[in-house]
């Protein structure tokens, strides 16, 4: 019997969710960066810079960028780790990963790339100093399993950074809902010729755990000293936890 889960507001089988999420990112990959700039009015660049700073990445670190897609975080981590570091770009979606890899090569930078499932990471225990997942955990079916895998591959003293859409400050909720369910699909239709994927984005944000719930999930996976930072009134939250 196949277990059920949610794809946005719709209940589907786990197999169907994996297929539908893959279809979303195959569809939006080509215009992904442009849509990020439009949807966030460029704020996503500041959120990602903040994530890098909070990660504590330093020269020589081994870093795993999960759901790294178009390599925004990978590029920023390289600035911190330098020539003695090792930054892996990974994603479950080949369309996204190909764009990220090509962007790196166009910049004259080569990093190891792997297409893999965050719930079954192909890396040894205690290997990475930093693990980061930005705007990817929301789409994972078994978030608890993925977080346990992130804990497994971190070396003692290492940190996990989770950057993700979260629960907005309540007084802003009506305005945010209007923007999410009206403006985002409209922009998706005009720019990416795909309103359905951006409707899923709005729905998936509502189904994602709250700031406190995600903190608890990270603690249950083994992370310690877990804390979070609300960015842009909680539109996005950055969680950080350590492995000791």
Swiss-Prot record:
EC annotation from Swiss-Prot or TrEMBL: 2.1.1.163, 2.1.1.201
Name the UniProt key words of this record, in alphabetical order.
Answer: Menaquinone biosynthesis, Methyltransferase, S-adenosyl-L-methionine, Transferase, Ubiquinone biosynthesis
List the CDD domains hit by this protein, alphabetically: AdoMet_MTases
- Origin: domain of life: Bacteria
Could you confirm whether the keyword Chloroplast appears in this record?
Answer: no
The record's InterPro entries line, in alphabetical order, gives: SAM-dependent_MTases_sf, UbiE/COQ5_MeTrFase, UbiE/COQ5_MeTrFase_CS
The region annotated as signal peptide is: none
Q: Name one GO molecular function term.
A: 2-methoxy-6-polyprenyl-1,4-benzoquinol methyltransferase activity
Q: Does the keyword Thylakoid apply?
A: no
Q: Which reaction does it catalyse?
A: a 2-demethylmenaquinol + S-adenosyl-L-methionine = a menaquinol + S-adenosyl-L-homocysteine + H(+); a 2-methoxy-6-(all-trans-polyprenyl)benzene-1,4-diol + S-adenosyl-L-methionine = a 5-methoxy-2-methyl-3-(all-trans-polyprenyl)benzene-1,4-diol + S-adenosyl-L-homocysteine + H(+)
Query: Binding residues for S-adenosyl-L-methionine, per the UniProt record?
Result: 70, 91, 117-118
Sorted alphabetically, the Gene Ontology BP terms of this entry are: aerobic respiration; menaquinone biosynthetic process; methylation
Q: Which Pfam families does the record cross-reference, listed alphabetically? A: Ubie_methyltran (PF01209)
Pathway of this protein?
Quinol/quinone metabolism; menaquinone biosynthesis; menaquinol from 1,4-dihydroxy-2-naphthoate: step 2/2; Cofactor biosynthesis; ubiquinone biosynthesis
Q: Which family does it belong to?
A: Belongs to the class I-like SAM-binding methyltransferase superfamily. MenG/UbiE family.
Summarize the protein's role. Methyltransferase required for the conversion of demethylmenaquinol (DMKH2) to menaquinol (MKH2) and the conversion of 2-polyprenyl-6-methoxy-1,4-benzoquinol (DDMQH2) to 2-polyprenyl-3-methyl-6-methoxy-1,4-benzoquinol (DMQH2).
| HAMAP family in UniProt | MenG_UbiE_methyltr
Q: What protein am I looking at? A: Ubiquinone/menaquinone biosynthesis C-methyltransferase UbiE
Q: Which organism is it from?
A: Nitrosomonas europaea (strain ATCC 19718 / CIP 103999 / KCTC 2705 / NBRC 14298)
